[in-house]
């Protein structure tokens, strides 16, 4: 997927500490978002920057930094951010949110993972399952 990313880089007086040098050999990450106004936000690499009004684009060395910046943006009521992985050959892959809905939100098509239709008090006694090889959360309903 060769998607071209567009947007302005936020105004930042510091540096990434050379973290993006590794991206020339391995990979880097980009986060894009739209801001209704110019405002200051905390950079995940340290320091503060001023985002521009409209479309913003920022390159970071790690996916975790993009996720951390996304949580900063959500505090500022900006929820339209997207995270991309950019490979050294220029190929771009959209990685977060994978199906367009954030993980903590309900999506009608999303499958439930490790869901048991019971209350915590209805879990089986762990002492009875101790050497059976079955975890309490995986045990069938009584």
Curated annotation (Swiss-Prot):
The keyword Mitochondrion does not apply. InterPro entries: PsaD, PsaD_sf. It comes from the Bacteria. One of its GO terms (biological process) is photosynthesis. Keywords: Photosynthesis, Photosystem I. It holds the Pfam family PsaD. One of its GO terms (cellular component) is photosystem I reaction center. Belongs to the PsaD family. PsaD can form complexes with ferredoxin and ferredoxin-oxidoreductase in photosystem I (PS I) reaction center. This is Photosystem I reaction center subunit II. It comes from Mastigocladus laminosus (Fischerella sp.). The gene is psaD.
């Amino acid at each position: 997927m060769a998607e071209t990313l567009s947007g302005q880089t936020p105004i930042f007086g510091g540096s990434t500490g050379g973290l993006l040098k590794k991206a020339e050999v391995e990979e880097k990450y980009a986060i894009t978002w739209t801001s209704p106004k110019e405002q200051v936000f905390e950079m995940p690499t340290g320091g503060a920057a001023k985002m521009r009004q409209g479309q913003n684009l920022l390159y970071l060395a790690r996916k975790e930094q993009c996720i951390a910046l996304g949580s900063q943006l959500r505090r500022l009521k900006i929820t339209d951010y997207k995270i991309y992985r950019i490979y050294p050959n220029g190929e771009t892959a959209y990685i977060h949110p994978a199906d367009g809905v954030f993980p903590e939100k309900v999506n009608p098509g999303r499958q439930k993972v490790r869901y048991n239709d019971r209350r915590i008090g209805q879990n089986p006694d762990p002492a009875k399952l101790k050497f059976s090889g079955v975890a309490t959360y995986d045990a069938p309903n009584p």
